[in-house]
Amino acid sequence: MEVVEAAAQLQTLKFGGSGPGSAASPPPEERPDAEQAEQAPPAGEQPPPAPSSDAGENPPPPSGPCATAPDAAEPLPELQDSDSSDSDSDSETDSDSSSSSSSSSSSSSSCGSLPPVLSDGEEDVQVEKENKNFPLKTKDELLLNELPSVEELTVTLPEDIALKPLGKVSSIIEQLVIIESMTNIPPVNEDTVIFKSDRQAAGKIFEIFGPVAHPFYVLRFNSSEHIESKGIKIKDTMYFAPSMKDFTQYIFTEKLKQDRGSDASWKNDQEPPPEALDFSDDEKEKEAKQRKKSQIQGRKKLKSELNESGEDFGEVHQNWNANSSSEHSKGYHNREFTRGFPRGRYSRGSHGRPPPQQYYNSDPMASQESLGFPPQRQDNPVMPHYPFPPPMFDMHNFPLPPPPPPPPTVSMGWAAPSMTSHPVLNLPYSLPPPPLPPPPPPPSPGESNSSHFGSYY
């Protein structure tokens, strides 16, 4: 509040002493009062003083060159003193305000240091530091610090046991030592003991990665200080004892080639199960595909053979039907109906009773019409060929009924429609039976010569 009041007074004083007389008056320390009085402008030229507390207390003197000059010069030193004091206070207030502003800026900077504002690069560095504290891992993965501590090996090989170089230390990463194997060296398996040049054990192989012909071996230690205590450095040559079966375990590469492997990950970034693995060898994969293809071809061949056997069976059945139909038609193919009389097996009964000569006529149709028989069609005397036998019975073994006996000699006017058909021939089947032969005409009582029928049989 003091600073604000001082600033208000300074504004008031500046407004009151803004006239030309106050600006032209020198400070009292450098000039005497007489000079100030001589240099003071006349009273008529001075502007009226501003309304202030000082002006109210000291009214201006009456006008006059002699009386006003010394009297008017008297309040000027006080005004200059007040102006100088005001300027001093103004400088003090400015210094105070600058100090207060600097203190406020320092306080604001001290307050802003609690939540620092970081740039993008600083944020990335901070995130990386946090990730180092909390590394990413899968569901069942174990970190190095979660593994049990490595046991200390105090094995020293005697001089009579041969050592063979395995590889050189390529890098050291925290608590891991990476060894790059040499060429033409059989690969060794995990838990193989690795020795230094002084025949002391360096550690056991923790993990193997890289190609089979040129693998990389990893030695795990408890910390980086543990590695330094062992005296292991980059480019150091590491050895193994090939003759010691307790310390050295080999990897059989041929067996590895036969195993199935996959580079794909499975659930939770784990290794896939055996049933989901792919072949690691192209030849084995090709052989398996060929075997599967042969199985499919065998199935197709068996199916085609079954289809062919079914077709053969259908062909045999069709041939049997054709043979049976041809044999069935043989019984009727050679039976010709000439002049209404049959040949073959049914002509025996007609030899004993030939018709008389007077009823014989060269025209068979006229003779049949004269006897009252229906005319016989001659356009197709041969029976039609049926491809299949009737379904109800076999016509080969079923005998046809014998022809009806001839009518008596007296009755000559009966006709063929009065004949009763055989009950067996009226069975319901699709193909009609062959028509019955007409009966022979009755013989004449005066003639018994049967030579007329010799030419027909």
Swiss-Prot record:
Q: Where is this region: Disordered?
A: 1-132, 261-303, 316-388, 423-457
Residue ranges, compositional bias (Low complexity): 96-110
Question: Which of the residues bear the PTM N-acetylmethionine?
Answer: M1
Q: PTM Phosphoserine: at which residues?
A: S280
Keywords, A to Z, come to: Acetylation, Cytoplasm, Isopeptide bond, Nucleus, Phosphoprotein, Ribonucleoprotein, Ribosome biogenesis, RNA-binding, rRNA processing, Ubl conjugation
Which Gene Ontology terms describe the biological processes this protein takes part in?
A: box H/ACA snoRNP assembly; positive regulation of telomere maintenance via telomerase; positive regulation of telomere maintenance via telomere lengthening; pseudouridine synthesis; ribosome biogenesis; RNA stabilization; rRNA processing; telomerase holoenzyme complex assembly
Keyword set includes Acetylation: yes
The GO terms describing molecular function are:
identical protein binding; RNA binding; telomerase RNA binding
> Keyword Ubl conjugation: yes or no?
yes
Localization of this protein: Cytoplasm; Nucleus
- Please provide one cellular component term from the Gene Ontology annotations of this protein: cytoplasm
User: Cross-link Glycyl lysine isopeptide (Lys-Gly) (interchain with G-Cter in SUMO2): which residues?
Assistant: K303
Q: Enumerate the Pfam families for this protein.
A: Gar1 (PF04410)
* Main location as per UniProt: cytoplasm
* Compositional bias (Basic residues): 289-302
User: What domain of life is recorded for the organism?
Assistant: Eukaryota
Biased-composition ranges for Polar residues? 358-370, 446-457
Feature: compositional bias, Acidic residues: 80-95
The record's similarity note reads: Belongs to the NAF1 family.
What this protein is reported to do is described as: RNA-binding protein required for the maturation of box H/ACA snoRNPs complex and ribosome biogenesis. During assembly of the H/ACA snoRNPs complex, it associates with the complex and disappears during maturation of the complex and is replaced by NOLA1/GAR1 to yield mature H/ACA snoRNPs complex. Probably competes with NOLA1/GAR1 for binding with DKC1/NOLA4.
Q: How does it assemble?
A: During assembly of the complex, component of the small nucleolar ribonucleoprotein particles containing H/ACA-type snoRNAs (H/ACA snoRNPs) which contains NOLA2/NHP2, NOLA3/NOP10, NAF1 and DKC1/NOLA4. Interacts directly with DKC1/NOLA4.
In its UniProt entry, what is this protein called?
H/ACA ribonucleoprotein complex non-core subunit NAF1
Name the gene.
Answer: Naf1
